[in-house]
C-alpha cells in the first residue's frame, strides 16, 4: 500500500542511524555525510510513496558542529606535522573557513541530488525543505542552522545550470 506525503524524521535517522537498501547507515561523522544520507533517505522514500515529503534543515545543523570539531583536530594535526605553532584562536579560524566550505558542499549535494533524482516509480521527488530558525535551540546549533539556511537560499537564488550550461 502506497503512502501519500510525509514529514521525514531525519533527526532520528541521522542521530540514531537507519537502514537503506538493507545496509545499516551509522550516525554521520560530518555535515556533508549527513547531507548525503538525507538525500539517500529522500530517494528511498520517494520511491515507495506518491506525494511530497518534508525535511528540516534543523535536523542537519547539529552535524555542522561534528564537522567543526573534526576540522579543528585536523587543522591542529596538520600544523603540528609542519611544525607551525598557532594559537587555538588561529586554529579555530582556519577550521571555521573549512566548515563554511563543507556547508557549501553539503548544501550543493542536496540541491543536485534532489533536482536530478529519478525514483523507481518514474517521478522526481517532491521535497519541501523546512528552514525555520526557531526549530534549533539558541546558541551554536542555531547559529549553524542560520549558516546552512543562508547557504541553501544563496544556492537557490544562484540556481543550477541546465543541460546547455545556462
Q: What are the residue ranges of the model-derived segments?
A:
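Catalytic alpha/beta active-site cores
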Residues: 1-166
